[in-house]
Amino acid sequence: MLMFDPVPVKQEAMDPVSVSFPSNYIESMKPNKYGVIYSTPLPDKFFQTPEGLTHGIQVEPVDLTVNKRGSPPAAGGSPSSLKFPSHRRASPGLSMPSSSPPIKKYSPPSPGVQPFGVPLSMPPVMAAALSRHGIRSPGILPVIQPVVVQPVPFMYTSHLQQPLMVSLSEEMDNSNSGMPVPVIESYEKPLLQKKIKIEPGIEPQRTDYYPEEMSPPLMNPVSPPQALLQENHPSVIVQPGKRPLPVESPDTQRKRRIHRCDYDGCNKVYTKSSHLKAHRRTHTGEKPYKCTWEGCTWKFARSDELTRHFRKHTGIKPFQCPDCDRSFSRSDHLALHRKRHMLV
């Protein structure tokens, strides 16, 4: 976990080393306000080297500053034995408390120094490891593996809040799984936006309007707040084909064929030709439907009238009241009977 401490950590002096140090290195190692603290202690591995190769070797931290102008490293008894100039005091970027495990704190370089590439190798803290284990003999050379820092986004938050580091890979995995991830806002990554589900019926539909049917108030421009309200809550739009057409319009007459009675003084109009034929029989007196019951001589101009009449002979009453046990041979008689139940 990354922790950012705005207050410089108290520094403790280490064993002095009598080596001169360039002035430009002192400027580059000034304490910075922000630093990265790696709380996990580094694995300390010590190996015993031959006494012939360890005489004259000086244990010093490795400097990785880009614009360092120090002297080139001098070759020692082995390829790994290198000498680098070190500071007389403890480095400002390294803090080593005596009562806690070693913590390596890295301070970013000054603005004039070119930033390092990623991944980078952190310099091993050899003097801190020696002082921790109580090793003072120059014959033992501690070998500490360098730490490789993976590219993760740094999120600088206030020192009063709990620091949080979110990796890009973890965030992508969480987004694919559908689980919500709490993320603190930072200056280096944009705000996360939630996906909004849009219903298909919310979008306003395009409708063709007839200019002769539109009233003048509808043509007035709508103010922006009203337009936004109409966009969020669209009104019900009736399609032109579903609108009830006027009675006297030519479209209505074309769609609904009107059958008029051609007798003088009769203004009866029917939508079906069969109804017009039955009506014309009232003028002519024709009654083609005759009752077939034995001894019955009744005739009717309409077939439905003959059907109702024939039920008198058979006694069939197909229309039964749901509120009582009475039955009727005609539907209009049943409707009249049910009205009586409603009044009572």
Swiss-Prot record:
Residues joined by cross-link Glycyl lysine isopeptide (Lys-Gly) (interchain with G-Cter in SUMO2): 68, 195, 197
Region (Disordered): 66-111, 235-254
One Pfam family cited in the UniProt record for this chain: zf-C2H2
Motif (9aaTAD): 60-68
GO BP term, example: negative regulation of transcription by RNA polymerase II
Biased composition (Low complexity): 70-81, 91-107
Superkingdom of origin organism: Eukaryota
S-S pairs: none
Post-translational modifications: Sumoylated with SUMO1. Sumoylation is enhanced by PIAS1, PIAS2alpha and PIAS2beta, and PIAS4, but not by Pc2. Enhances transcriptional repression, but has no effect on DNA binding. Sumoylation on Lys-197 is the major site.
Subunit: Monomer.
Function: Binds to the CACCC box of erythroid cell-expressed genes. May play a role in hematopoiesis.
Protein's name in the database: Krueppel-like factor 3
Record gene name: Klf3
